[in-house]
């Protein structure tokens, strides 16, 4: 990586194991340019070089500014990345700065690639790790990790270059937050204690995670390589990762149980090999499916009244006076992401190198949100559907198509020029439905039922992201380079209502990050010392900001809010 004229950091399998790296937070601790906004497993997102609007992980928000890959598949999701357990990994690559030409949208500020270990047809290999840890003022952690590598040549001579690698992990993370007794006074219901409704317990926020990965590879006699991989991970947590300072250190006070379930499957297929003597090809297809279900206690919000009916979820609930103060928030998310890429690249020994490819991706995100109550209404003339007092049901379809390429041309024996581009087109469909507890129509039986609002939005966009790089090697121990590159996030659609249509934009434009970078890589003291660095200045134009304004919309929306600059060094 010290010979590549770009900012890249690689964490090897040996370093991952030596430092007991197990999740993305551990990776971020090794990379100064990465910042993690951690709201618990599956609800965290990260950014590189500070390129963030300070968004709060809302599912209706803008796409991520930094891409997460596992092998050849992008996994970044709006509102929170999957919390992949790091085990049996070959290396982790961190590419800082815009990677828009080769990696596309959401690689606006950089890309993190987790590369799994490939099966080895040469030898049988297996191993396992057992861990047990004690959490101060909490419950213990424990984990089991194991892998096995099996060459398949014993099946048939034609399988001499084939192998299967299987890994498995099962982890329990102990809690350290206590759910303690508290009281809350409600305007219509008086004072209630949470101990009347929920079992109070110490170490409230524990979690379990387990998963397995199966990977098969085979190199055929004609030089073709086939690689097939399947990954599944299941995660379940109890409790909250928030704390209430009014109750004391590491304490919360909840009225309803809270859980978070996050399961995903990933399947990938890669075929690669020589197309001609001087050209190789790679064809990859991958699918990613993720299902999330979680509940969140919302009871204490009910204590506040008097806001606009259309902006305050709790108003209807308190106005019509339930006999039970408990309110909870439930959400169901479903992600289906399919990616296909075909690329060819030169494999000559000359300084002239190139890569050319095509990419297509479909990404469907469905999310349902409900604010539910548990008690009976004191005014029996008002009824709700499934005890819900506000709900939304949304399906967001994004499609992206692109062609991309880079070419490196030697200017002279010591200087190379690289030019790249990505021509992309995006299409967005957004089906949205929501409604309040007080939004009713009369049925034949004389009861009322929720009707809500339904909208369908559509949007298309296109653009070109360029890259220019010049690299100069004055001697064998020094490389200096300069880069201009662009990264982007695609345009999108907001859900608006009639009364705020003139205040909230129906759509938002793609934003653009323009990066100017100068760097160097050097070795000193006969190769014993490595000294690398860079400085950068980035202009973030029309940057997308996720906003929530209670008196405008019941959900978050995205707006282009101007230009920002980011400068720094690494």
Residue ranges, per PLM feature:
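Outer-membrane beta-barrel domain signature, strongest for Gram-negative TonB-dependent receptors
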Residues: 194-355, 360-363, 530-532
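Structural signature of Gram-negative outer-membrane beta-barrels, strongest in the C-terminal barrel
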Residues: 217-222, 344-347, 358-361, 394-538
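Transmembrane beta-barrel wall of Gram-negative outer-membrane proteins
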Residues: 127, 136-238, 263-267, 336, ...
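Extracytoplasmic beta-strand/coil segments of soluble accessory domains associated
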Residues: 25, 29-73
């Amino acid at each position: 990586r010290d010979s590549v004229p770009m900012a890249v950091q690689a964490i090897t399998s040996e370093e991952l194991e030596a430092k007991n790296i197990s999740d993305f937070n551990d990776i971020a601790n090794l990379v100064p340019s990465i910042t993690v906004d951690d709201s618990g497993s599956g609800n965290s997102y990260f950014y590189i070089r500070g390129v963030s609007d300070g968004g709060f992980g809302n599912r209706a928000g803008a796409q991520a500014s930094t891409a997460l890959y596992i092998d050849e598949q992008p996994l970044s999701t709006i509102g929170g990345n999957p919390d992949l357990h790091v085990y049996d990994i070959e290396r982790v690559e961190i590419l800082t700065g815009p990677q828009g030409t080769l990696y596309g949208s959401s690689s606006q500020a950089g890309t993190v690639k987790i590369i799994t270990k490939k099966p080895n047809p040469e030898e049988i290999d297996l191993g396992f790790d057992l861990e047990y840890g004690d959490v101060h003022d909490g419950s213990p952690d424990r984990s089991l990790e194991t892998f096995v590598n099996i060459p398949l040549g014993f099946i048939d001579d034609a399988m001499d270059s084939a192998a299967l690698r299987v890994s498995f992990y099962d982890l329990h993370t102990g809690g350290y937050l206590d759910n303690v007794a508290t009281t809350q006074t409600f305007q219509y219901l008086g004072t209630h204690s949470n101990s009347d409704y929920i079992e109070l317990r110490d170490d409230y926020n524990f979690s379990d995670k387990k998963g397995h990965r199966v990977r098969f590879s085979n190199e055929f006699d004609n030089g073709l390589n086939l690689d097939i991989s399947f990954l599944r991970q299941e995660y379940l947590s109890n409790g909250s990762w928030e704390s209430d300072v009014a109750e004391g250190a590491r304490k919360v006070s909840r009225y309803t149980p809270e859980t978070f379930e996050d399961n995903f499957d990933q399947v990938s297929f890669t075929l690669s090999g020589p197309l001609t003597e001087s050209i190789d090809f790679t064809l990859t297809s991958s699918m990613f499916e993720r299902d999330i279900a979680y509940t969140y206690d919302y009871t204490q919000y009910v204590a506040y009244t008097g806001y606009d009916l259309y902006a305050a979820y709790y108003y209807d609930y308190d106005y019509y006076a339930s006999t039970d103060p408990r309110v909870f928030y439930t959400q169901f998310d479903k992600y289906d992401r399919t990616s296909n890429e075909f690329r060819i690249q030169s494999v000559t020994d000359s300084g002239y190198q190139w890569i050319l490819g095509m990419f297509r991706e479909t990404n469907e995100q469905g999310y349902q949100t409900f604010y539910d109550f548990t008690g009976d209404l004191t005014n029996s003339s008002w009824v709700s559907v499934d005890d819900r007092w506000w709900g939304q049901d949304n399906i967001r379809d994004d499609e992206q198509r692109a062609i991309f390429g880079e070419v490196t041309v030697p200017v002279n024996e010591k200087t190379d020029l690289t030019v790249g581009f990505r021509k992309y087109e995006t299409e967005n469909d957004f089906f949205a439905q929501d409604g309040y507890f007080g939004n009713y129509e009369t049925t034949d039986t004389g009861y009322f039922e929720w009707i809500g609002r339904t909208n369908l939005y559509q949007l298309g966009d296109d653009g070109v992201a360029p890259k220019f790089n010049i690299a100069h090697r004055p001697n064998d121990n020094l490389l200096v380079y300069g880069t201009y590159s662009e990264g982007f996030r695609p345009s999108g659609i907001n859900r608006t209502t009639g009364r705020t249509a003139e205040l909230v934009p129906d759509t938002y434009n793609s934003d653009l990050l323009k990066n100017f970078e100068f760097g160097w890589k050097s070795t000193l003291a006969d190769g014993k010392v490595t000294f690398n660095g860079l400085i950068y200045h980035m202009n973030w134009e029309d940057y997308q900001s996720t906003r929530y304004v209670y008196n405008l919309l019941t959900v978050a929306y995205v707006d282009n809010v101007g230009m920002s600059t980011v400068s720094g060094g690494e």
